[in-house]
Amino acid sequence: MIPLIALLLTMSSQPATPYTSNISLSSQHVRRDFVPDGDLDKGVWRLVPHATFEHNFTGEKRYPELKTEVASLWSDKYVYFAFWCKYREINVYQGEDPAKERWGLWERDVVEVFLNPEPAKVNHYYEFEVSPNNQWLDLEINLDKKPFNDAGWNSSFEHAVRIDKERHLWMCEMRIPLSAMKTRIVPGSQWRGNFYRAEGTGSDEQRSLLAWSTVVARPEAFHNPSRFGVIRFVP
């Protein structure tokens, strides 16, 4: 029998995980790469698991009229994400060139993917945003630096959107190069990440801010990596 003091010392020497969320999404492997076109009715998305969220980022309010679904696929070169977003009204920047990166995109309707391919480096991750009119933003995040968001980083991720006005549904498809994050995926890989959505006009207090894995209400609340969920890459 191991002496109690030795057992306690052994337990204390094992690093505790910094993550406090166990929510997970499975990302399935796809053999053939494809370019995003915003059509989420195509066969590749029909049988993959979906994660659904309709609560605000703290989990205290629910917005069933803003039901959001997200799914993921991966290949040897890319990780893909698809969003289905119920909406009330569309709020976007008007008359701008969607080919150009848009700083402050989070102040309009947007879906956001936060990805950490190296979970041991809790404060280092990547952010990808797309709006209903296909404007975009990508950032490398390092919370140990000031400023913590590097807008000069360019992932060359591809994205496309479609809006179904009859169903009050806007859809987004993303394809993110693994090389941009200096990583690769094999079956069994596990990343950390979160999915967010912003909807509505006015201040943050007036808008609807949703999260897949809930976070603590605080300044820069979305940047709370200890609350990132698990993305499991399966065959």
Model-derived regions: residue spans:
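Sec-dependent signal peptide recognition
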Residues: 1-7
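Structural preference for beta-rich elements and adjacent junctions enriched in aromatics
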Residues: 13-235
